[in-house]
């Protein structure tokens, strides 16, 4: 697996992400400095981008949004997100631009 996805001690996936808010659409834009680069249409105001990120990841990984957790980076472009162990990280790259 890529450097941006690793297993946590509890068996969950930990994703290291770089987020660009205010993009034209929600899309995985490849890798950037060891992180998965995701562009989001939502603005980085009033927690809109974080909410959009979790919704986008849930759809891409086919898991419930409530099973994702923002671990670090609440106000940063660099984020750590935990996903359940049965999530398939490679699904995030299937539609990368």
Residue map of PLM features:
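C-terminal catalytic core of tyrosine-transesterase DNA break-rejoin enzymes
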Residues: 60
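Contiguous, often N-terminal, cationic amphipathic patches that form binding interfaces
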Residues: 1-54, 63-65, 69-74, 79-97
């Amino acid at each position: 697996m890529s450097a941006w996805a690793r297993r946590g001690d509890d068996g969950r996936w930990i994703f290291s992400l770089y987020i660009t808010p205010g993009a034209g659409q929600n899309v995985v834009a490849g890798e950037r400095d060891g992180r998965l680069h995701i562009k989001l249409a939502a603005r980085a105001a009033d927690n809109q981008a974080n909410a959009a990120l979790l919704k986008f990841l849930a759809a891409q990984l086919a898991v419930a949004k409530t099973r994702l957790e923002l671990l670090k980076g609440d106000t940063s472009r660099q984020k750590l997100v935990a996903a359940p162990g049965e999530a398939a990280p490679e699904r995030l790259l299937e539609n990368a631009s």
